[in-house]
Amino acid sequence: MTVRTRYAPSPTGSLHIGNVRSGLFAYLFARRYGGAFILRIDDTDQQRSSKESLDEILASLRWLGIDWDEGPPDPAYFQSNRLGRYRDAVRGLLKAGMAYPCYCTPEELEAKRRQAEREKRKPVYDGKCRELPFDPEIALPQPGEARSCAIRFRTPRDGETIVEDLVKGRAVFANSELDDLIIFRSDGLPTYNLASVVDDIDMRITHVVRGDDHLPNTPRQVRIFEALGSAPPQFAHLPMVLGMDGKPLSKRHGVTSVFAYRDAGYLPEALLNYLARLGWSYGDQEIFSKSELMEKFDLANCGKSAGIFNSEKLLWLNFHYLKERPIAQLANEIKPFIEKRGYPVPTDDGWLQMAVATLRERAKTLVEMAEFAHFYLSAEIDLDPKAANKFLTSQVLEPLRALTETLDSSPSLKLCDRRHPSDPSQREREAASALQEATQLCGPAASDLIHRCMAASAGNSADPLQLLADSAQIVEKLFTGVLARFNLKLGQLAQPVRVALTGGTVSPGIFEVIAVMGRERTVQRLRAAVARIEAQSRPAAE
């Protein structure tokens, strides 16, 4: 038997996290056993369905890396294009005596429901129209046509319906508790239970993987499968996804749609990994690539209890994938988030890779990374008043002034400034003095270092991270010289410099920050800090 699973979202809104997890499990099960994954669009509710929702659903699945073997854009996989098939199925059930017309009005049914509630009974259809004679050739209402009757399925009154669920185990339902559900509405449209069964038969679905909120529908669907002459597929009902408060995951728990997480700066690999582990386990392993999931996933390892959506765990996973991401890919992915914050997107991909390399050790999302990049991207920054008052004081005025002049006059640092590169002819003229300084600072390795810096600052390097390392090495040597001159420890000068360059007290390593920021902007901000200290140190005018 070839495994065939399906996922059937309705295009009536965004793709919900709990919903897409069911689709993911169906997808992984099909991939594990070399089967086919079918995407079907349940769009019979044309009033609520929209092209925008459909486009978002398809884009969400593609973003997560969930691809389908059969489905859109093929029109055969849209329920709205299969209405004739459902009508044929209903006619067959009517002729076989397995369905009958129901003339009860909505008002009658509502009154009976309220009466059952008052008597503390389960509200089920009482079968008023079940034994009425009818013409099996009765004309079915057309879509949009208001008729006086709906069509109900004739559920057996005696015996039991048994569902051998691959996750929940055996579930036994008394047929007397299963009312005669409506399978074809008076407006000419099929109900979910009929359309789903007919589609599963026609699409040769072998395994139905879905949330356990569908479990009450399952015995009814099993009976419809049998009435249509088809063996039901195997069912796997997954426990619901709950919030940390133990309630069903909803908007009150924060972002719940796939695209909301994308827009919040999560990587698809992180969300896919997290959703796969939400109700499924493989030993103690937490990190799974997509290929590992397809290799190891099995419904037998799905838990029976509800999955708790832990946003901190998802953040932890996202942090892991950010750190493991190829730097060039990460730099490209952060661009929309930079633009959204109102900054011009850097055109130098190499420089952006350098910046991202310093930021990803702290950022848990792409949104955070773009926020942290503000001091690199802004022409001017605002200093945190508390930090500035604490660290930009007269005690560091002379060391700060000395560092400013040291960095400004450094030919090797100027050569490494990819953010503000010199023109080619000037770089050639400056190379000799840069090499001389670098040799004094870095020893015999200086020649290779300077040649790499020349190539990288000109945009010719295949490895911007090497330029970052080389530039940071030069900065460290220059910094160390100033520390020795004033007999200071690193923190005594590094923190004032950090405040001057970034506006705050937390940043990546200060040598790397200077390397990315470049000599020109670094010197500009240090001079502004020196001027601030000088202004505050002057006696107040009489």
Where would I find each of the regions flagged by the language model?
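Acidic active-site catalytic centers that drive phospho-/nucleotidyl reactions
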Residues: 16-18, 42, 180, 193, ...
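N-terminal Rossmann-like or analogous alpha/beta NTP/dinucleotide-binding catalytic cores
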Residues: 1-119, 217-230
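Glycine- and acidic
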Residues: 5-11, 39-43, 203-208, 256, ...
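Conserved nucleotide- and phosphate/pyrophosphate-binding catalytic cores
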Residues: 49-51, 55, 64-65, 172-175, ...
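Short beta->alpha junction loops/turns
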Residues: 46, 79-82, 156, 211-214, ...
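Hydrophobic alpha-helical segments in the ANL/AMP-binding
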Residues: 27-28, 61, 193-195, 497
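Short acidic, glycine/Ser/Thr-rich loop/turn "cap" segments at secondary-structure junctions
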Residues: 71-77, 205-206, 255-257
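Active-site cores that bind ATP or allylic diphosphates and position pyrophosphate for catalysis
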Residues: 100-101, 105-237, 242-249, 257, ...
